[in-house]
Amino acid sequence: MVLRNPEKKGIASTLDERSGEIFRRIVETYLESGEPLGSRNLSRLLPMSLSPASVRNVMSDLEDLGLIYSPHVSAGRLPTQTGLRFFVDAFMQVGNLSAEERTSIERQVRRADRDQPIDSLLAEASQMLSGMSRGAGLVITTKSDPVLKHVEFIRLAPTKALAVLVGDHDQVENRIIELPAGITSAQLTEAANFVNAHLAGQTIPELRSQLEKVKETVRGELDALSQDLVERGLAIWSGSEGDEKPARLIVRGRANLLEGLEGTEDIERLRMLFDDLEKKDSLIELLDLAESGPGVRIFIGSENKLFSLSGSSLIVAPYRDSDDRIVGAVGVIGPTRLNYSRIVPMVDYTAQLMSRLSR
């Protein structure tokens, strides 16, 4: 379910039982409360008998390895980002969702009416992840190709028109198109009627793949100016062959990330994070991260440049369509002290559910 780092497994093998147990207790206390754990309290929690002085010696070794640190003099210890990654890769036990939890996820996601646009389903998935994780639920979807339902060309000026494409779910795409010189309003109507009669029921990529055949049909039934207009319309709707970019980011539960923040600097860093997430390049990067390995991926703090300033973590997994193509990703954004072992199976199951519903 989660990618493991073999190098971290190697480090784990160098720790003896007491070092591993002390490290695990420090991290688990941090994830539960956010508080540092001191040697005196640690010695009481350990299953083996160790004095506070012996615990401090082990903690010193763990500090030398870069796994823990002291936030200030005489304080207990907290995990570093390296320590958190080490814990996730080598120590974390990922449980399974209960039947009740799986049912709850399905019920919440399926609240969206199947006759409604896919955006309703995505919004429900994002809201569900936010509510169950107490973080921000994230859904990224690639741009879907609408099935052509209706086309219209509306003249705006002697040399410009608005090309309107209506898809099968009544989604509308508008493009400004340069008109062939001398084309009449009657020819605009003729071109639109041709598209609606002969090309409706197909997606733009499907039309693009048989463009030469379409051109031959156009030449056989339309005059030269109307032919030119139809070909221009197909070209401007199609875009370039590699222009399939993530089109939508849905985030729910942003307010959850404000809990526990102190000072305007922390809030400003979080605001910058969400501003960055709205940028197209960031969406592409997030989707690439989800695609970079099988199953759920975990990115802690500065491991991902998008989250380095805000100190946030991302747990993300891709979902697929009926052709097994990755068409989006679901995930959770939260502080570095997320409950990783609980959220990982939640994200994994949601991605599986989204894959089933996208088929």
From Swiss-Prot:
Instruction: Name the GO terms of the biological process aspect.
Output: negative regulation of DNA-templated transcription
The protein's UniProt keywords, in alphabetical order, are: Repressor, Stress response, Transcription, Transcription regulation
Note the superkingdom of the native organism. Answer: Bacteria
Query: What taxonomic lineage is listed for the species of origin?
Result: Bacteria, Pseudomonadati, Pseudomonadota, Alphaproteobacteria, Hyphomicrobiales
Entry similarity comment: Belongs to the HrcA family.
What does the protein in this record do? Answer: Negative regulator of class I heat shock genes (grpE-dnaK-dnaJ and groELS operons). Prevents heat-shock induction of these operons.
| Pfam families reported for this sequence | HrcA
Q: Entry's PANTHER family?
A: HEAT-INDUCIBLE TRANSCRIPTION REPRESSOR HRCA
Q: What GO molecular function annotations does the UniProt record carry, in alphabetical order? A: DNA binding
- NCBIfam families in the record, alphabetically? hrcA
Provide the protein name.
Answer: Heat-inducible transcription repressor HrcA
